[in-house]
């Protein structure tokens, strides 16, 4: 295909001066000039929230050229109906359509919020009262009141870890044994350190709005109600690099075993302070065989998911420091801090944050806002009684056994909802329930489950219809 293409990419693409050159030719395909203005028009549609940087332009330019090549090839070979070309074209259209199906102000807000939160690492403890998103009002109130009672006990001075062990539905609060007999101490509700996108959005928001030492009111997430205590807050470590010497505890280690290992670790640490080579000592003594022959050096790490006692001293030391023995349930670690990096500037990390945002459930907020606005545009008609009848016809055991079948629901060929002139049938919704039946749990209320499934289903259908009509409704999209 390339022999039909003579590409003259102007140097203006490599700088911001591109945006003053929109009357010039960007590339030539089979003697057809493609102006800069055409590229700019499509680029800005998809990139209103992205800086006009060289990296951003280069990335989108490849996509644009591939699109023009495919389109020209289709026209040249008259393969408009050939499946593989249509699929390629549809992929491009779908990507372009996405920028019209999200609320850009919401994306901007979430992006800026994420970068602000990225500047600090927080350490939290929590006590969970488990509750399904589809619980009935009675069970919801019961769980909420239980969470309030837990908070009251904490405010009256009950030890957080003790109460977490007794009352939390998060099993990590309590001691557990590994398959090889090693005891993993419970965390007493201490979740360690985290940063933006490491936790459920509702949980993250609550944590970042607490002051150190403060205990939250009950916070609802998809897994239940949480009582959250913020125990530490530090300027964020974007990533850090260390070498360590691990002296591992044996399974079922006694107090004497631990004392012996402590004495050995103290001795090694003194050798290091007296000038001994860390890498040689790691190779000689470390029980972490994966890193011992590398001088104890580990890959780049982030604080998230690491044992808090392992991470805590990193905040208070600088590169080049040797950190005294640190205890985890594995044993004792002597740490050499090689490097520690703060979060990059916004421009450097923006694409990373956008990628994480698009994969995170909070991104649905931007889609939901568009769907809600479209509900005021489209004429939507449905009878809520149909949802009641659908819920009554579903066998609860079939949902729990993941064996629900559409045939349980009567009148599958009847219309469930009309969106303007588009008819959506009961069988379409029944199939949606079937695909999502794994979300249902034993304590769920079927009617609430059906209602929330319908809300999501309706939003999806509205966005699908809007997507199909973009050419008719938006001249710029059709261009």
Where do the model's predicted regions map?
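Positively charged n-region of N-terminal signal peptides that target proteins for export
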Residues: 1-4
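Peptidyl-prolyl cis-trans isomerase
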Residues: 21-34, 40-479
